[in-house]
């Protein structure tokens, strides 16, 4: 059955990693509702490592764009873009190094994740209800100041598990004047170093833990995550070009309430997830 659990985890990760609905919240539901019999440390490490598949999907989807980095020496747009990505990563790196263990110890609880989903959904609805005219329509035109601010917004997902890294970075970008497609694309780019670094570090540190379920099952999860995420990226980009995020806002609230109901009924334990 391990292969089936790996497949399901990969599907859930691939769908939810880049959509603003919290992969953390959905992986919690998946693991608990399916009663996955893996030790907790295996489950936690597996969930992080298969993010590598989703990150690879971004690299493949945008491979032509990423190749433009070859011209960074004389292309001002590429210089602005990658300076922005580096600056946007700084707040998350600092926060993760200083407080990562504390956050995992005290904040990774289903109830915390549920309220993050609900509050994030409400904020998403309110942001989409305001009348504002975006002033940035290309990721190469994002200023250094805006990039750093988006990186700070992304930290909300670290401080409040379940808020969603993609949601916090996309909403932060929109609040700063990026249009939806531009904010979404920059969030994808930002996820490469942020999530890729975490996945690689966990893989290096925890190879012995992952050995408990075998390299084949890890590969199944990562490959499935890659394939599903690739199509999820394309779908989301098409969606945001003509739609707003209010549907995601409602969905987040529904999932958050569902988690709270499951906790109240004893189906889902509210102990620490870290």
Curated annotation (Swiss-Prot):
It holds the Pfam family BacA. It is found in: Cell membrane. It catalyses: di-trans,octa-cis-undecaprenyl diphosphate + H2O = di-trans,octa-cis-undecaprenyl phosphate + phosphate + H(+). The chain crosses the membrane at residues 1-21, 42-62, 81-101, 107-127, 142-162, 184-204, 213-233, 248-268. It is a multi-pass membrane protein. It comes from the Bacteria. It is an enzyme of class 3 (hydrolase). Keywords: Antibiotic resistance, Cell membrane, Cell shape, Cell wall biogenesis/degradation, Hydrolase, Membrane, Peptidoglycan synthesis, Transmembrane, Transmembrane helix. GO terms for biological process: cell wall organization; peptidoglycan biosynthetic process; peptidoglycan metabolic process; regulation of cell shape; response to antibiotic. Its EC number is 3.6.1.27. Bacitracin is thought to be involved in the inhibition of peptidoglycan synthesis by sequestering undecaprenyl diphosphate, thereby reducing the pool of lipid carrier available. Catalyzes the dephosphorylation of undecaprenyl diphosphate (UPP). Confers resistance to bacitracin. This is Undecaprenyl-diphosphatase. It comes from Deinococcus radiodurans (strain ATCC 13939 / DSM 20539 / JCM 16871 / CCUG 27074 / LMG 4051 / NBRC 15346 / NCIMB 9279 / VKM B-1422 / R1). The gene is uppP.
């Amino acid at each position: 059955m391990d292969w089936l659990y790996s497949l399901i985890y990969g599907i859930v990760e691939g769908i939810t990693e880049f959509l603003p609905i919290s992969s953390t919240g959905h992986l919690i539901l998946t693991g608990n509702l399916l009663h996955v019999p893996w030790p907790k440390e295996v489950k936690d490490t597996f969930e992080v490592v298969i993010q590598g598949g989703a990150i690879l999907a971004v690299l493949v989807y945008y491979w032509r764009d990423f190749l433009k980095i070859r011209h960074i020496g004389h292309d001002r747009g590429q210089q602005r873009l990658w300076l922005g990505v580096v600056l946007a990563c700084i707040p998350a790196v600092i926060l993760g190094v200083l407080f990562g263990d504390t956050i995992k110890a005290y904040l990774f609880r289903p109830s915390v994740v549920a309220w993050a989903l609900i509050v994030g959904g409400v904020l998403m609805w309110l942001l989409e209800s305001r009348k504002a005219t975006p002033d940035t329509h290309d990721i190469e035109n994002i200023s250094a100041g805006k990039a750093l601010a988006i990186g700070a917004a992304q930290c909300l997902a670290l401080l409040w598990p379940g808020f969603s890294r993609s949601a916090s970075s996309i909403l932060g970008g929109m609040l700063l004047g990026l249009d939806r497609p531009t904010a979404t694309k920059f969030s994808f780019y930002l996820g490469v170093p942020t999530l890729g670094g975490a996945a690689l570090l966990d893989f290096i540190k925890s190879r012995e833990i992952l050995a408990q379920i075998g390299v084949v099952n890890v590969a199944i999860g990562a490959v499935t995550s890659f394939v599903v995420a690739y199509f999820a990226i394309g779908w989301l980009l098409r969606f945001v070009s003509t739609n707003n995020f209010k549907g995601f806002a409602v969905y987040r609230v529904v999932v958050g309430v569902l988690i709270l109901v499951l906790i109240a009924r004893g189906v889902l334990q509210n102990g620490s997830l870290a």
